[in-house]
């Protein structure tokens, strides 16, 4: 009887640890398609490869999400010419109906679409059984690597939110600018001087 209880306790512990796992960062960004209200057209994340991207998942009625969208609008205008792009996806039920009013009200200078919750959870590597706190903000570099991912309860969204977002964007743009260009095939190799 004691052995059975021990086995059950260990199994429960192992399963609970699985559900508490955080997303792996950095990691390669999988493809992600954001639905739009223009029929069958989707926004493919891969079409922004080569740009630094902030992908924000929101609830259109969430005040924290609205505040972050406002900050990201400012950042899009400031950093867009340097290769930065914001993409947004609403994930609430009936999001397809809520997005047009949200866009009209907040007028973000970037695409806003919608997705079902499960596809977003998969993309975020967020366990289905855990609460999803909004907004969810993902920073992707020009090589399509997720460099940072923040949940709505993270200190990142505190009083210094704008400063934190700016620092992430500048880091993405700086890191990708510092990446050396590949040499053409057949280019002579540098010799080490000893």
Where are these regions (language model features)?
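Structural microenvironment flanking redox-active thiols in thiol-disulfide oxidoreductases
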Residues: 66-107, 117-123
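N-terminal "domain-start" segment that seeds a small globular fold
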Residues: 21-45
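Hydrophobic beta-strand anchors of alpha/beta hydrolase catalytic cores
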Residues: 54-55, 86, 137
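Bacterial N-terminal signal peptides
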Residues: 8-18
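Short active-site neighborhood of thiol/selenol oxidoreductases, capturing the structured segment around
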Residues: 44-66
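Thiol/disulfide oxidoreductase modules built on the thioredoxin-like
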Residues: 106-108, 117-164, 168
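Bacterial N-terminal signal peptides that target proteins for export
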Residues: 1-9
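Compositionally biased, proline/threonine/alanine/serine-rich low-complexity intrinsically disordered stretches
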Residues: 177-194
């Amino acid at each position: 009887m004691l052995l059975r209880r021990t086995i059950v306790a260990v199994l429960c512990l192992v399963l609970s640890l699985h559900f508490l796992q955080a997303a792996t960062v950095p990691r390669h960004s999988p493809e992600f398609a954001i639905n739009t209200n223009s029929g069958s057209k989707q926004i493919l994340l891969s079409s922004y490869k080569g740009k630094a991207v902030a992908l924000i998942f929101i609830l259109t009625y969430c005040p924290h999400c609205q505040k972050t969208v406002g900050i990201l609008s400012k950042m899009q205008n400031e950093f867009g010419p340097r290769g930065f792009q914001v993409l947004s996806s609403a994930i609430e039920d009936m999001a397809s109906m809520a997005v047009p009013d949200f866009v009209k009200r907040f007028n973000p200078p970037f695409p806003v679409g919608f997705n079902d919750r499960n596809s977003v959870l998969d993309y975020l590597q967020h366990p289905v059984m855990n609460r999803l706190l909004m907004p969810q903000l993902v920073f992707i570099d020009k090589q399509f690597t997720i460099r940072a991912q923040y949940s709505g309860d993270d200190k990142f969204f505190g009083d210094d939110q704008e400063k934190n977002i700016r620092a992430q964007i500048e880091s993405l743009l700086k890191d990708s600018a510092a990446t050396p260009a590949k040499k053409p095939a057949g280019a002579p190799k540098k010799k080490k001087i000893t």
